[in-house]
Regions:
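Start-of-domain marker
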Residues: 2-64
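Short loop/turn motifs that connect adjacent beta-strands in outer-membrane beta-barrel proteins
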Residues: 2-10, 78-86, 137-143, 196-206
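Extracellular/periplasm-exposed beta-strand and loop segments of Gram-negative cell-envelope proteins
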Residues: 23, 49-65, 98-108, 112-124, ...
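Membrane-embedded beta-strand positions of outer-membrane beta-barrel proteins
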Residues: 14-16, 36, 47, 73, ...
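Transmembrane beta-strands of outer-membrane beta-barrel pores
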Residues: 18-22, 40-42, 51-55, 75-77, ...
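Structural signature of outer-membrane beta-barrel channels/translocons
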Residues: 37-41, 74-80, 132-136, 140, ...
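Residues that define the transmembrane beta-barrel architecture of outer-membrane proteins
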Residues: 10-12, 28-32, 65-69, 85, ...
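Outer-membrane beta-barrel "beta-signal"
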Residues: 70, 180-206
Length: 206
């Protein structure tokens, strides 16, 4: 039977990226991220937000911090799941605003000199194709992950400081010069489901 469309929201899903919290102590980049999802019919409206700091000290010093957000729609292919699992594919628009500082040393006429470039108004935007799953663990507690293909990235800011890292996007460079115009990301979430009302799994049309 055909299913009656139901556009009234029935739940809100609120979560945090716990995978990042585990990786942070071992990484030069510190990320903290959360999300809110609202269902309507077979779709989810997603709003994601985060903060990132980075510090790289090798042949040069590069550091900065900033915030980012993503908004988008995803289709839930598991609307008839009795255990309230969610399996989605969707599209996001993402944007980041951040500051960055680059410090390096070079020698001129036998003397070592230090050069500093700073940009407090850097920004970037990109798009994402996503696929994800959330499964129920206990009561309203859920566990899940989202895989992202990030593409069509564009950066804005001081031309003298090409971003090495972009909050929410990741590494902007494959090496010292070559840019990463596309990349893949993975988030591992714990979330809590707030039910707004009961929703029938399927309602046949007469």
């Amino acid at each position: 039977p055909r299913v009656e469309r139901d556009w009234k929201p029935s739940f809100v899903l609120v979560g945090a990226d716990v995978g990042r919290m585990v990786i942070n102590p071992l990484s030069e980049v510190q990320n903290y991220e959360g999300f809110v999802s609202l269902d309507f019919d077979r779709y989810l409206f997603n709003a994601e937000f985060g903060h990132s700091t980075f510090h790289r000290d090798d042949e040069f010093l590069y550091e900065g911090s900033g915030t980012y957000y993503r908004i988008g729609l995803a289709k839930n292919f598991a609307v008839a799941s009795k255990d309230r699992s969610i399996f989605t594919m969707g599209l996001n628009y993402a944007r980041s605003n951040f500051d960055q500082t680059l410090i390096f040393e070079d020698s001129f006429f036998g003397e070592q000199s230090e050069f500093t470039f700073q940009d407090n108004n850097a920004a970037a935007r990109w798009w994402e194709l996503t696929g994800g799953i959330h499964v129920n663990l206990w009561e309203n507690l859920n566990m899940g992950y989202v895989v992202r293909l990030k593409f069509l990235k564009k950066t804005f800011g001081d031309e003298n400081v090409e971003p090495w890292d972009v909050p929410g996007y990741g590494r902007n460079k494959k090496n010292g010069t070559e840019l990463k115009n596309a990349t893949v990301g993975l988030n591992y979430y714990l979330s809590w489901r707030f039910d707004l009302r009961e929703k029938a799994l399927s309602v046949p049309r007469s």
